Amino acid sequence: MVTRCVREAALLAWVVLWMLSTRVGTLLLCGRLSFSGAAGESPSVRRFADMPLERREATLQRWNRTRWLFPLRIVFTLVKILSHYVFYAMVNEKSQNPHWNAIGYRVEEWREEQAEPLAPAHARSRPLDSGVVETRALNDTTLLRSLADRGLAAKPGSSDAHHTVQCDAVIVGSGCGGGVAAAMLASSGYKVVVIEKGDYFTADDYSSIEGPSMERLFERGGIFCTSNVTTMLFTGATVGGGSAVNWSACIRTPGEVLQEWSREHGLPLFASPGYEQAMDAVCTRLGVTDGCLQEGFQNKVLRRGCEALGLPVDAVPRNSSDGHYCGSCNFGCPTGDKRGTDTTWLADAVNRGAVVLTGCKADRFILESNSGKNGRSKKCVGLLATCLSNGITKKLHIQAKVSISACGALMTPPLLRSSGLKNRHIGRNLHLHPVSMAWGYFPENKQGAPITGKSYEGGIITSMHRVTERTIIETPALSPGGFAAMVPWESGRDMKERMRQFARTAHAFALVRDRGAGFVDCEGRLRFTPNRDDTRELRHGLRRVLRILVAAGAAEVGTHRSDGLRLWCKGVRDEDLEAFLDEVTIEKGPMHSTTDKWALFSSAHQMGSCRMGSSSKDGAVDGRGESWEAEGLYVCDGSLLPTAVGVNPMITIQSLAYCLSKDIAQSLAYGKKH
């Protein structure tokens, strides 16, 4: 709880749990429900653990609905999410969970399908073996030896100094931006060092098991909430970053978005032929395919519902083969078919001499006075980083001609601030593509033409419906723990019934290109609340999702609102459906006390927190990605985007990184000549 929650929420939960262990505290928090005693006897107060089950349940229901005592609602939310997640996601020493059979869930065993047995793990080569240095298993001596073996000039530090490493370019982060930048610079002949906080895994390491996979592949173990408790965030923290755990959607930057960024934000790059060529190059390197031979259950539901309503539905390109039927790519693709930066751009980089340091966290960029040269008062000369191994006692001082922050929209702003940068746009303008979900239950024995499959099978996103210019509908990846954490809790019995229907419950979500902006306050703390316009778009999109689910033949549909809003669809009339849809609302998080209903948004896309601008008044960096304050310091990740892009942003981020790193390579070449 402490590692996955904001400090205040964890402290609040601790206080409430302590109070519930006492009679006085239970009386204060539970009121009359804590009383016991037979008729005619004086009532006594029980501790929460001694209360009858039905009274404990009634207490939680009261906390869920309380309007003014929102701290109790926050504790309810926290306990509900974590307890259900742990119950359904965690496994024993045999990688099994005894509850999965009851809900119709099983983990796909992809390796059983291979014709030949795999070689032992130590005998198999990995795409990055020639360039990766996994520091968690090293000490000071073996670290320096590993760096030297990979062609880096590394000097040991004295008793109180840092180890010094020399290179041409240091890149913090190995995801969509950092991976592309590393490949482009290394292919131009420069010595590149990539710093990655997470660890390196390949297809052979991915288990598709929710609990362990979330723990080692995602920031904060995959349970990461905004500090104002409005949005659950999912962001990769491994080699390959988000590209290793995303849902494979490869959608080009929409033309109207490119025009907006060029005209309204004064960034001509986005209207240039070079950017279009970059998108072509990125899609080619990722092996993007446009079709899907067999869709999974949820996408079949989305497609059937759209077709029944006469709505357009588009096939979503993916960075995998058209026959890819993996439903667990969000835990790293166990088939190796999905092509993230860890198997493409980073492989290109290490083949050209780049070195990737895993288990290594950037502390700050090293800035020196620049005497106002080029309008920048500072110059970046490298990076200070800490290896997370207990055996490595000294920090790394990486000297570089060019330094690039590519650790994502949540981590780049704190890194730049800790380095001494002051631009007011650093950490502002955060966009999250907030998502609101709806669900539909499709019994297997339904008459007619049933939709076959289970909710966790098949490609995660293969179909998309565009509601408006700003809102799209897609399907999510929800394994048992995530499903249980996010669906409403009304009672213990109701929750069991929801989980019993897990395998045949299809989810779809409305995603909005948000205009409201959040703030990254520091590492691990951010605030976000959609504005009214975003909320209207989300409500319109969520209502459309429900119509699609009903049209697809769902027996029951509902939303994730805390009161469990739902509709039984058998024999439903048009007027009944419209009345139900009129009840659909987009609620804020449990901290907001204006209503007894609440909901959480979800976000897998974070953008804009160090946006590009035509001047220092408009953005944190210039149109080349270079800091307005420090020469030689660049940003090359999703935080650059001027606004939300409105679709899955992987292709946009990689294409932008392609253009910027190509320009950085040319700048380095120019510096050599002059």
Language-model-derived ranges and their functions:
Residues M1-E108:
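Flexible, low-complexity segments enriched for small/polar residues
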Residues F48, E54-F76, F87, V239, ...:
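Rossmann-like flavin
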Residues I81, Y88, N97-R150, A154, ...:
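Conserved redox-cofactor binding core of oxidoreductases
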Residues Q166-V194:
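N-terminal Rossmann-like FAD-binding beta1-loop-alpha1 element of flavoenzymes
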Residues M184-G211, M232, T238, N351, ...:
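Glycine-rich loop(s) and the adjacent beta-strand/alpha-helix scaffold that form part
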Residues Y190, K197-E256, N299-E307:
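N-terminal FAD cofactor-binding segment of flavoenzymes
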Residues N423-V550, E556, R566, D596, ...:
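FAD cofactor-binding and catalytic pocket of flavoenzymes
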Residues T643-K662:
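A conserved FAD-binding loop/helix module that cradles the flavin
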